[in-house]
Amino acid sequence: MAKKKSEDHSGADANDSDYNEEPNFDDPPNFVDNISDEDLLGDMLAQRPSEADGVESVVVVDNMPKVEPSRLDKLKSVINKLFSHCGEIVNVVYPVDEEGNTKGYAFMEYKTASQAEDAVKKLNNHRLDKNYTFAVNLFTDFQKYENIPEKWEPPTVQPFKVQSDLYNFINDPDTYDQYCVAAETAPNCVQVGFWQNTLPEPNELETRERFTDTFVKWSPLGTYVVTFHKPGVAIWGGSSFQKIQKFPHPGTQFVEFSPCENYLVTYGPTPTGQKIIIWDIRTGGEKRSFVGDGMSVLSMFRWSHDDKYVARMGESSIHIYETPSFYLLDLKSIKIPGIRGFSWSPTDNVIAYWVEEQNQIPARVTLMKIPKKREIRNKNLFHVADCKLHWQKSGDYLCVKVDRYSKLKKDKKELDVKFLGMFYNFEIFHMREKEIPVDSIEIRELILAFAWEPIGNKFSIIHGEQNSANVSFYEVNKGVKPSLVKRLEKKSCTHLFWSPRGQFIVMANLTMGTFEFVDTTNDYIISASPDHFRASEVEWDPTGRYVVTGVSSWKVKEDTGFNMYTLQGRIIKRTILKNFVQFLWRPRPPTLLSEEKQKEIKKNLKKYYPTFEQKDRLRLTRASKELLEKRAQLRETFMEYRNKRIAEWKDQKSRRQMLRGHVDTDNLETDEVDEEVVEFLVKEEITLLE
């Protein structure tokens, strides 16, 4: 509220009075307001109270079975059980004919209108069985459709919007990769810059101020980038990163794309848990929504590799939904008592899940083929505390890390369970071999990390004490037990990052910011050991040629930025960026070349070397020429600025002499200066001697 000008400040200048006087909000004379209330206050008018007629909480359920009086009680039981999940049902009416048979629809009244809306959203188009699919509508919808005008008016033709090419980023003749860099410029305001990793210096493609509130995320194939905002999320794409689609879901904290980029899942909080919405990316429409209990494993959806199925884990069950209808597979969940975790194969419609020990029944790892729900492999496990499922990227192997115990200690109420004498097993499933054989490796030390080679048959583990751990590399071959091929001892690392193309690996300590680059085909020699103090992330580019380490402001506030290295660990670029948040390489879609064509190119790769080397020389020559021209331009600009300032300095000579007693201090020699020494008392101290 503006403060009135007081008498004590009557002598203030005009600038101060501008701030103290109350502003005038009156419209100027002859002002015409051409903005409607709907345009100006649309969000508020949508919430204004309206006259109610008492039927807002009533829904109409159509396409129900028509049953005789003897079967009516059973139908009521089924319907009540299904619809009571949406809220408290106050009254239900089943209209009947003269013989007492139901007419195939019912009126259902909920306690509140919001519960009725929730029932329509969740149960409309719900399949009761193969013959009956519910049509659920609000009773007020009938009144709305009664007011449809009799004269039909054709819809207004919308102008065609030319959409940018979403795949232009893979048309670059030199196949340079792209990346984005995010930095926070103000609270809830993040600037995002998009770059192309050209040589010798990266090329800036686009920079967006206030592009997102928190962070960004690429889609799996690199087609879209998603941004987070208070009303929801938006996806962007094309050559200039224009908005493609927006999805209204207030407070969205996390999103997940389906592998083929057909669907988007948004996770947002609610007062009682979490709301999860699955969207169609191309249309922007909502396919289905769920209510979860928070960011727990029971809330997370997992997609099959081909987008045909999406699954989530429930209490003693797995719910698998088919796309695009998002109905349950075979209209029912898969009952699996004691299930603790599951994961899809990255290349096949196979689900791996594990079940905990129950009543002297051993734990079990199972592979199930979808959609037939046929179990193709089982493995029983004893004394199991926990399991982790690790698929190799190519889908050739599945490793189950089993945390086992020697002794189990429970308190009297069996609420607190302690596992003693822990040791670990790796169960390796050979997915491409007949009957899926399983190999087992036992490790008696603490396992700190596990990582598969994405393309290849090796995996690596960190085991032992954290400050002096060992890194072991195992090789998996057909018909032979996995063998230890190399052990690097006394390594201070916490994470393992394989190159997307295999062969090279970075052993990282994300606590201390130390890194070691290893070539697994060259006797596991450490090619470089750079440091990046406080680094909290490591990102390989899609081709496996470059590695980026970053210090994010989410972790620290000083010395934030990122470093770029070659795959051998040679530093290429150091960038210090205030409030740096994220560095993300843009993913690439899989190649369209057949395996035969790829093998042919690899076989004849040497004949392409001269062409590549010539292009590199021309590029460096061009870059050197551009660099020399840039330096010459900078020197010319500097000399022009210098000459201008010298001319100003000479023009001010008479003024300087006048201010300095008509002494030309510009040409004053050292021997013309009179030096005078002045002494004065600073302080006086008196010390008494005994």
Swiss-Prot record:
Residues 57-141 form the RRM domain. InterPro entries: EIF3B, eIF3B_RRM, Nucleotide-bd_a/b_plait_sf, RBD_domain_sf, RRM_dom, TIF_beta_prop-like, WD40/YVTN_repeat-like_dom_sf. Residues 1-11 have a biased composition (Basic and acidic residues). WD repeats lie at residues 207-246, 292-331, 334-369, 442-484, 530-575. Residues 1-33 are annotated as: Disordered. One of its GO terms (molecular function) is RNA binding. RNA-binding component of the eukaryotic translation initiation factor 3 (eIF-3) complex, which is involved in protein synthesis of a specialized repertoire of mRNAs and, together with other initiation factors, stimulates binding of mRNA and methionyl-tRNAi to the 40S ribosome. The eIF-3 complex specifically targets and initiates translation of a subset of mRNAs involved in cell proliferation. Component of the eukaryotic translation initiation factor 3 (eIF-3) complex. The eIF-3 complex interacts with pix. Interacts with mxt. Belongs to the eIF-3 subunit B family. This is Eukaryotic translation initiation factor 3 subunit B.
